């Protein structure tokens, strides 16, 4: 297990605040009850008064405090959750209808809607209040130097992998400086903590998220040609790569030809309840022994690091959360993202004249390419499959590859390596056209293609990263991979999937007035559900993917936009 990380961002004082907020969270559950209870709300509360808040909490009745007593306590000692992120003035690079915006979107309803989605960037743009840096002991929010674009709703702070699709949308909106601000905020986190945090909160310092920082930098460079920006962020890309190459993330697997391959896994530095969901984690772990609880909490945090929290993908038994085994899984998508990172770093190093570094990372990407195809590729299914390590607790220096250890359940992640075809750093295509077509056929037969997009899995477990939910990032990764595969038929399928996704987003927006975090891909126009919190709106990555699809494919005058 990875070592437990101390809460960063304010040292002992930050730990003390978080401890207080978790006690408030627990007391609030007793006072308000479980219906519509969101534990994250309470660890996001800024402390408005001094440390007497702890004594006042202790003085509440030993029996469950009443609703009124709890409301009065919170009102007396805390500011509103999210009040330490202040609405920013309109970003200076925002224009209501920027020149060159979506020139191939011809249908009036489609264009009007796209402009409304574009305008949402104003609503989601924030600045961290100066009080956060002045009094870090009163905030779980971390200070950041630039403007931030938040996902929306309960997600009041910056999140790592969400930011990639926010950046993609901002580039379509010609908001290049705001896109750079987002990246520089993440670089600030790398410089301070050694990696990009899951999100900009002190309680997220124990884990990261799918690593897409280099992809953001590459897309911004391709849009702007800003070499100074590349030079500024390049050292942080190297630092982040080192984080993912650390011993706790690395796994060595020997194939049947005796070749040893190094791949990566998720591994949070935590073995306690997640502060933002502590009451939920404690309930799941209530019947476990102390040692089993620590293992469970570690797996829960590691699963949160995947971005897929939660899914049957990570469970030995999809009906039992305590069977999460994420740190014993070599994920297809994580290794895709790290290979892309290595390609990007090789490209940037060559660009800025560091030829030796470029060669090192080019070789690293080729080695990971071979590893992915040797360990994760399944020729019978024509898909890449997650690889499960033994879960008996016996760590091995090198694991012997076994066919039976590939997880043959079908997930959208099985097709994510196609996305490596879409990279623009001038290196060779990851999947040749013939293989891409075979993977496309496998996708068509998989059961994942639904009327409103690509389902996340085939298992309807009630978890949000399972059937029938579809998520914007997965649509985008697979569509871009198909699009750049070199096959005309794959391009047609890519456009068909994008069309389904645009239509369901449009109809849901017209029905609710909002963009949603996820969608039910069985029914066009229906938002998604499931998971440990209520469905959210806003929504950063959904907005970014819609703008990207409209930019890529346009929308002809004679093509209907609704379901």
Curated annotation (Swiss-Prot):
Highest rank taxon of the organism: Eukaryota
Record-listed substrate binding positions: 154, 161-162, 198, 207-209, 274-276, 307, 532
Keyword hit for Hydrolase: yes
SUPFAM superfamilies: Six-hairpin glycosidases (SSF48208)
PROSITE patterns in the cross-refs: TREHALASE_2
GO cellular component: plasma membrane
Catalysed reactions, as listed in the record: alpha,alpha-trehalose + H2O = alpha-D-glucose + beta-D-glucose
Stored Pfam families: Trehalase (PF01204)
Enzyme Commission (EC) number: 3.2.1.28
GO BP, one annotated term: trehalose catabolic process
Annotated InterPro entries: 6-hairpin_glycosidase_sf, 6hp_glycosidase-like_sf, Glyco_hydro_37, Glyco_hydro_37_CS
Alphabetized GO MF terms: alpha,alpha-trehalase activity
Active-site positions on this chain: 309 (proton donor/acceptor), 517 (proton donor/acceptor)
Keyword terms, alphabetized: Glycosidase, Hydrolase, Stress response
Keyword check for Ion transport: no
Family: Belongs to the glycosyl hydrolase 37 family.
Function: Involved in the regulation of trehalose content by hydrolyzing trehalose to glucose.
Designated name of the protein: Probable trehalase
Source lineage: Eukaryota, Viridiplantae, Streptophyta, Embryophyta, Tracheophyta
